[in-house]
């Protein structure tokens, strides 16, 4: 048996798609355990770029079963489109397994998400307005609608009509918007019933049986650790637990079944939307990283904020997730920079902080303390061995590894599937 969790060690967009694709090539199951279509990753296959937001990356491999587990929230309209896109590329989607206990994103969730975000004005969270937060809120309030509900017309209609009553009070009384119509939602979701009936499986049992049969399982996280609802830069976080502990909870397996926890980080750091960002570069360095790194959101197309790699937050991610190793992506983006900085501490009120601060206000006021390295000019995209990297690049990687006290076992030096260094 081999079970591996792959997750982001930053604010998402770390290049997890390429890493999960690397693992998926030998996996029997690839399991999404949280989130919805609010995060995306792009997998480059030759000249083709395949952008996935909800379907696990294992769908690209004929011998792998992609699983959307109970910790996820599902926009069935979006899923239908994504499956159609894959089918048009002659990719088999019949093997997709969907948990009956995953919650459904309803049209009113997306409407509420947009209205709530707009009402925050300058204090906007930066949500993708996909309905993720309101869907998880309904789940916690025990009024959510699950995948299995769609298989029973009477149950589904009853739950929709019950939820609509409260939702319409919010829409009409608070936001002064017209009410939504239950019958229209019911009719829309009748068109999605085939998706559910064709793919619904007891995914917890499916994973358990795979473990008993010593199969290889990959648990694929979305977003990143610093967006975790409990451990991230609250309130500028997502609505689910993105850290490693949720791989077990969101999939319906026990934590003792997890063998390996891989964190993914870029050689620098980026963030989408609002929230504190201590090493952000609002200058030509930031512009350089954005342009060379193609730092624009897969889902939203938004320009990402970029900055130097923050080892304090990275070491925090190591702790929160019990990372067994670290994968670094986009090292090639740093090629061409004369000097490169690594954040090794925070300065706050004349005090040097070397542990990640729990106090929210510190993240807005702290200043980064940098260690500066000489850069390199060589094109490293064809490099296959660590020893063949420029000496300055080797020093940069070794410094990161020594600071976080976790081995770096994989370095991506280009966007292609094969442009990697395995250590």
Each language-model region and where it sits:
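Non-transmembrane, aqueous-exposed alpha-helical and coiled segments at domain scale
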Residues: 1-423
